[in-house]
Amino acid sequence: MKLTRHNGRSGKHGTYNPRHNDRRFDVENSEHIDAERARQNVYWDCYRGFTTHDFRENPEQPDFSFEEIERMYYYEHYADHVNAQNARNEKTRHIERNRTVDDLLKNNKTCPEESIYQIGTMEESVPPETLALIVSEFYEEFENRFGSHIHILDWALHLDEGTPHISRKRRWRNWVSLSLNRNSQKESTITGNRLLMQSVG
């Protein structure tokens, strides 16, 4: 059976919307989503770990959307760098280069990268538990190879569409910092490539 993986950051309507992955929209009016089966979806994020639809409905549990999770992560890890870069821009009288953390989330070069994993087709696929196990082992190997240079922000096991699949958002930890420094783009590319080579080697 074929394993399919698709990576991307944006489509024709802009950067991928995290609300699609954690189903923070009216699924009743979506043609390709079964609203009843949507309650079986499993979600994970880097701050709380695993959650489900029932977890969301529990008033005693903190409920954060993937959109909020990704925003929190970006503010926690990149706000200081954004502010420092903006200060340098102002010092050199290039305030037109200033950005906000929210700008990073909306930009298709600095937003989280999304990967979709699927085994099989609508006609034939593996049980959701098998898919989750295989992808978990893949994540573990990914972590062993790239370590702290990459960070998984959130993922969802979708059981409410034609074929079970996992949608995951990740962030190359140093890539946003490198992308912000426009005055040394060539040096940034060299540094980024060096980081990747160190991770793989």
Predicted regions and their residues:
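N-terminal nicking endonuclease/strand-transfer module with a His-rich metal-binding environment
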Residues: 1-201
